[in-house]
Amino acid sequence: MLRQIKVAVLFVLVAFSLMMEGTPDANADSKLPDPIKAGVAEKLFRLDCGRSLANDESVWTPGENAGRSIEFSSTCWLIKHGSEWLLWDAGVPEAALNDPRGWSTLPKLIVYHLDKTLTDQLAEIGLKPRDIARVAISHTHGDHIGNVGLFPNSTILMQQAEYSWIHSLNGPNDDVNQLMALARKLLGTPKNLQLIDGDTDVFGDGSVTLISTPGHTPGHQSLLVHLKNSGFIILSGDVVHSEENFEKNIVPSLNTNKTESIASMEKIRQLIAIYKATLFINHDKKQTDKLKLLPAFYD
């Protein structure tokens, strides 16, 4: 039995080493956690941060489903680590709650609606926006940073590549230019902005790790969370929009780089294999509807 355990541990370590060599960002200074020694976060809450209806699914599945409508979920996640709280993504702006027309990043394509504000959901577990120490954003599309302004004193974590991109002159087309302009408006000039480069261990113990997954946008990132009972969970951001897209390597037409998008999906597959992780896909409504919702949590 002892020999079997040693062999199993050796297999994990070898596989981890191979993954580190093969991932897009792999280098000697990688911040990916040791799958055996990683610390744990205490709780992971899902918040409902909006829902949307798009009028042409083929934007997300090029060559298929032209003219077919599709509904997406938008999810924020709240992580308790010791006495500190970290929010992952900030969702659709709270102002959308009282607008029957909804809110949009690209009005000709998609409309978002909100059923409950982020502030009200935090209040359900006794928190206020000022209690959130850090806000990490997957990328700067408006449905992910719509409420960053609620957290003026929080540290905002984002990739340097993402920040530089939205402040560059032009994107590849008018739709992307519109998304970039909205991002600059919603993000503003955070008082406490922490720009990072590549994979980053947020708390220094391997419990919460920002994973560089460019392609959807130049500085897109995902999040790897380690919990005591639930194990490793990957929060996708928009590295993938549905299980089908993930299985087939389908790259949405609004992504800024197809090659990077496919490489990032492969990186996520490698992480799933090494950490035996569960992938929560932000916009996949079928999956999201089955997940626990605050005040319930994963631990």
Model regions and ranges:
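Metallo-beta-lactamase
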Residues: V7, M20-D131, Q160-S212, E260-K276, ...
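Cap/insert and terminal regions of metallo-dependent hydrolase folds
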Residues: L109-D120, S222-L224, N229-D299
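Bacterial N-terminal signal peptides that target proteins for export
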Residues: M1-V9
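Core dinuclear metal-dependent hydrolase active-site scaffold
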Residues: R46, S69, C76-K80, L86, ...
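Active-site metal-binding loops of divalent metal-dependent hydrolases
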Residues: C49-G50, A90-V92, T140, A161, ...
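Bacterial N-terminal signal peptides
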Residues: V9-M19
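Active-site metal-binding motif and surrounding structural segment of the metallo-beta-lactamase
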Residues: P100-M158
